[in-house]
Swiss-Prot record:
Expressed in salivary glands. This is Complement inhibitor RaCI6. It is found in: Secreted. Residues 1-24 form the signal peptide. It comes from Dermacentor andersoni (Rocky mountain wood tick). Complement inhibitor. Prevents complement-mediated C5 activation by binding to C5. Binds C5 at a different binding site than the other tick complement inhibitors OmCI and CirpT1, and the drug eculizumab. Belongs to the RaCI family. GO terms for molecular function: toxin activity. The keyword ATP-binding does not apply. The keyword Signal applies. Disulfide bonds join C37-C61, C42-C63.
């Protein structure tokens, strides 16, 4: 009986160490940024037709302007959007559908 208790204690200790290692390695990894959306402002200004358009925001970035909608000339901040990959699967009816991987 003592050997069984020792074995259970050993398994619990190994499991706790494994879980601790998983969490500590995740915390030490930094997010890699490519910098295309950082520390650059985007603008909302009128085009040649007088319509307010947003400029200075490349694909993959979001321009957030903290000004009222009626303010035509305004500056904003760019944020990088997260990217996800989608996979296409075929349903039983034969029509393709798009699903996000978990």
């Amino acid at each position: 009986m003592a050997a069984l208790n020792g074995l259970v204690l050993l398994l619990l200790t190994i499991s706790a160490m494994f879980i601790s290692e998983c969490y500590s390695s995740g915390e030490s990894q930094s997010i890699q940024r490519n910098g295309r959306c950082e520390e650059v402002t985007c603008q909302r200004k009128p085009n040649h037709l007088g319509v307010a358009v947003t400029s200075g925001c490349p694909p993959g970035c979001l321009c957030v302007i903290q000004a009222p909608d009626n303010a035509v000339n305004a500056n904003g901040t760019r944020y990088e959007l997260m990217t996800t990959t989608t996979t296409k699967t075929t349903t039983t009816s034969g029509t393709p559908s798009s699903e996000d991987p978990e």
